[in-house]
Amino acid sequence: MSSGMHVALVTGGNKGIGLAIVRDLCRLFSGDVVLTARDVARGQAAVQQLQAEGLSPRFHQLDIDDLQSIRALRDFLRKEYGGLDVLVNNAGIAFKVADPTPFHIQAEVTMKTNFFGTRDVCTELLPLIKPQGRVVNVSSIMSVRALKSCSPELQQKFRSETITEEELVGLMNKFVEDTKKGVHQKEGWPSSAYGVTKIGVTVLSRIHARKLSEQRKGDRILLNACCPGWVRTDMAGPKATKSPEEGAETPVYLALLPPDAEGPHGQFVSEKRVEQW
């Protein structure tokens, strides 16, 4: 495998929106597409399913909660391709509405994967992104709703153009601590743990886009957060309005922005349109 070969990678690619994104990239992206999943058997089964459709993704194990797993993937990409052209951070979790797990545990578990896991992937893989690369962080419209339910003080912090990654990490940790103390509502947080983790993903995207513009100005890398919509998946359930294929549309659009595109960059995108944050 030569370092001249283009490569796209999708996290959480074995089912739902992730699998639909992999399928589209296999059809539309000129290069290799790597499907990653936490569970090797499920990931390989997804690859076989796509092979039966005449597509040929590669598989690599990735558990975004496990730093060693992330670093093994990083080393694989560096060795096989000399970097990465497209990264779609899709892996994430949500508790069902009726789940009896105590709220503070839901908050901690969801935050660990959706925010901190995604952040760890970015820390390890963003330095590998090649010039004209594309990074897509799958967030949610729930992040916009959760933001509107935050106190004005928190809203101001999350909308700040100068918030640092360290400050954001501090706020995400504070949310989890506040839920443990049972004071999260008094402290101005909304009642959706999932929504807060996705605020984290959207704001992290804004921070990373800003850093790329400052540190790699001429490389024309575009990084955005997006909402796939309300999609029929294991996570959202059967009543959702969109198919996984429809949910993949905006993430794939952002992953395949043409080389000469100036934007969007550092935006929250829904239905292929930039939404106000």
From Swiss-Prot:
GO terms for cellular component: cytoplasm. Substrate binds at S140. It holds the Pfam family adh_short. Glutathione binds at F95, K96, V97, Q106, A193, Y194. Keywords: Acetylation, Cytoplasm, Lipid metabolism, NADP, Oxidoreductase, Phosphoprotein. InterPro entries: CBR1-like, NAD(P)-bd_dom_sf, Sc_DH/Rdtase_CS, SDR_fam. One of its GO terms (molecular function) is 15-hydroxyprostaglandin-D dehydrogenase (NADP+) activity. PROSITE patterns: ADH_SHORT. It catalyses: a secondary alcohol + NADP(+) = a ketone + NADPH + H(+); prostaglandin F2alpha + NADP(+) = prostaglandin E2 + NADPH + H(+); prostaglandin E1 + NADP(+) = 15-oxoprostaglandin E1 + NADPH + H(+); menadione + NADPH + H(+) = menadiol + NADP(+). This is Carbonyl reductase [NADPH] 1. It comes from Pongo abelii (Sumatran orangutan). The lineage of its organism: Eukaryota, Metazoa, Chordata, Craniata, Vertebrata.
